[in-house]
Amino acid sequence: MANIGIIGGHGKVARLATPLLVERGNRVVSFIRKQEQTAEIEGLGAEAVVRDVMELSREELTELFRDAGLDAVVWSAGAGGGDPERTWKVDRDAAIRTMDAAEAAGATRYVMVSYMGASLNHSVPEDDDFYAYAQSKAEADEHLRGSNLEWTLLGPNLLSEEDPSGEIRVTAEPGESTASRANVARVIDAVLADASTIRKAIPFTDGQTPIAEAIGSVPAADRLDHAV
């Protein structure tokens, strides 16, 4: 059993992942921003901690994670687009602080939900609305790769609301394929149970290969913009 903290615990993917992790015998601590979300999160089997992680310092996060006794941290949060300033603040700065805090608190595992193609070589123009997000995620991912954490980078393609198939395709060339949020949740659960995914980047879409088999066959690649 592991003690797993989920950042962005009330997000769609996090709420789908929580009962899967609990069913596997893990203790899940879900970090949420609003008190009124507590009952729903507890109903999924997690412990709810109402703290705005995005506003906490590295030191405050370290104390929070240490008090929770975390072995692993899952980043499943995001600014949600729109305001570039908030995007930098959440998707880069807060994400990096949680990595540093996890390491300082003694957590060893970190799973980042990024996106397919995330890279410092993204080539998105600075005047493009997508630039703040692309650059923020790329810098956060790069920071994680340089840490001492046992990290896994997940790069789902465009998210959809399809029912879970439990099958994916590991690829950095998605075409028009999508990745259902329910399958992303299952991938989070699966990589946390599979040590062979440590220090690997896994870009994926929905596909025809069972998740456990697909992630178990991923070569040792550390980027989400390389074909697999």
Residue positions per predicted region:
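Structural motif
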Residues: 3, 71-72, 109
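Conserved Rossmann-fold NAD(P)-dependent oxidoreductase catalytic core, especially the SDR/UDP-sugar
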Residues: 27-29, 35, 79-146, 152
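NAD(P)H-binding glycine-rich loop region in Rossmannoid oxidoreductase-like domains
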Residues: 30-97, 101-104, 192-196
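Substrate-positioning beta->alpha
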Residues: 95, 136, 154, 174-190, ...
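Flexible, glycine-rich beta-alpha linker
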Residues: 120, 152-172, 204
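Glycine/proline-rich active-site loop of Rossmann-fold NAD(P)-dependent oxidoreductases
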Residues: 122, 163-168, 191-200
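Alpha-helical substrate-binding/gating segment
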Residues: 180-201, 205-228
